[in-house]
Amino acid sequence: MIESDTSSIMSGIIRNSGQNHHPSPQEYRLLATTSDDDLPGDLQSLSWLTAVDVPRLQQMASGRVDLGGPCVPHPHPGALAGVADLHVGATPSPLLHGPAGMAPRGMPGLGPITGHRDSMSQFPVGGQPSSGLQDPPHLYSPATQPQFPLPPGAQQCPPVGLYGPPFGVRPPYPQPHVAVHSSQELHPKHYPKPIYSYSCLIAMALKNSKTGSLPVSEIYSFMKEHFPYFKTAPDGWKNSVRHNLSLNKCFEKVENKMSGSSRKGCLWALNLARIDKMEEEMHKWKRKDLAAIHRSMANPEELDKLISDRPESCRRPGKPGEPEAPVLTHATTVAVAHGCLAVSQLPPQPLMTLSLQSVPLHHQVQPQAHLAPDSPAPAQTPPLHALPDLSPSPLPHPAMGRAPVDFINISTDMNTEVDALDPSIMDFALQGNLWEEMKDEGFSLDTLGAFADSPLGCDLGASGLTPASGGSDQSFPDLQVTGLYTAYSTPDSVAASGTSSSSQYLGAQGNKPIALL
């Protein structure tokens, strides 16, 4: 049989291989001299082994040689079929199914092909022969030539080698994205400089503190927190804050209660008298450009709170101080208006009304010029002693001992009812320095004859000083005897001057003395 003949031939070759590593060409032809009729059809193609360069064929099988290249000669179709049989093993050959040691060492190509069978068989995927090797006619078609320069397994490798790992294509896109985030963190939102003055910003910080006083460092922190412009602004703004604290009278330095601890430096607080002024200034800028203020703030919704809030220390002293100021002002006004001359050690006594009638007293005296008998002025200020009505009869002498006391306690009456009836009285009463003027002009008790032998009365009936009605029972309630005398001008001299100063009634020669209240 064929197997026995082949075995005998191979055994002879093996025996001679130990003596000669390079057998003669006759030994190569032993495989080809076998009759074609005795061999099966698949073994007839083995005749190409004597004429084909096996190393060249190995390179083509491994994919290192481009079969479609113009410089490579086209191999015999039988050679490709033999390669397919050797690598894939679809139709096993009796010659190659023997042990590996049966292959003659001196036969070029057989040994290397058998040794490389396992290593070359790993290229076909899944242990199946490629379509190009099974179908030789399609190998030379133009459409299938690009599939053979590289094996299927090798075609998957170049993309990885050229472009790196699967994520190698993506880094150019995420890297700019990350750079954008980092740039945003390094360059935050731009905040413009607030339109508020430094004094307003300092006042905001002090008004929104717990105690109403802060050190300079905490004022800095407040401004940077609520107005981020100062986070990146040059350090010159801190000098401006310190200058405002030192020079602006709206701020005052207070004692640091924690001076005994490690904290050093002074505290600054708002001047309570100027808090309202600062708040008004803040509201003015808010009305002027609210949008600009909001753009400069980290939290624009807190603006109203920063302007209006006050600490407890700024509220408490203001409430009791408000009623005190009007009281003091009223007392001062009353003292100046009344021109009080009363000695504080003396007991209080009723005030007396000082009335000087400026209208001329003659036969045609107008009723409006006199106070009505039922006027409240005499009732409100009763005289120190009972006074009789004026009459043509002489008046009694006053008590000499009580005159000085009465004079000391005389003060002007600010009764609005009396002033409304007689404007001349108002003019006289509002002169706060009246007594100083009288003193400069020589007004004294001695010159006026208050305690001298002056007439005790005047003949009013003879001089015609009675009212126009002629009734003897009527009197002049505005002329009362109090122990103080002065001189009154005659009707002729008074008629020429309407309302005049007090010097016109005092100390003139030829004037008739009359009694004053």
Curated annotation (Swiss-Prot):
Keywords: Developmental protein, DNA-binding, Neurogenesis, Nucleus, Transcription, Transcription regulation. It comes from Homo sapiens (Human). Transcription factor essential for neural and some non-neural tissues development, such as retina and lung respectively. Binds to an 11-bp consensus sequence containing the invariant tetranucleotide 5'-ACGC-3'. During development of the central nervous system, is required to specify the amacrine and horizontal cell fates from multipotent retinal progenitors while suppressing the alternative photoreceptor cell fates through activating DLL4-NOTCH signaling. Its main location: nucleus. Pfam families: Forkhead (PF00250). CDD domains: FH_FOXN4 (cd20057). The gene is FOXN4. Residues 365-398, 497-517 are annotated as: Disordered. This is Forkhead box protein N4. GO terms for molecular function: chromatin binding; cis-regulatory region sequence-specific DNA binding; DNA-binding transcription factor activity; DNA-binding transcription factor activity, RNA polymerase II-specific. The lineage of its organism: Eukaryota, Metazoa, Chordata, Craniata, Vertebrata. SUPFAM superfamilies: Winged helix' DNA-binding domain. GO terms for biological process: amacrine cell differentiation; atrioventricular canal development; heart looping; positive regulation of transcription by RNA polymerase II; regulation of DNA-templated transcription; regulation of heart contraction; retina layer formation; ventral spinal cord interneuron differentiation. It comes from the Eukaryota. It is found in: Nucleus. The keyword Nucleus applies. One of its GO terms (cellular component) is chromatin. Residues 193-289 bind DNA.
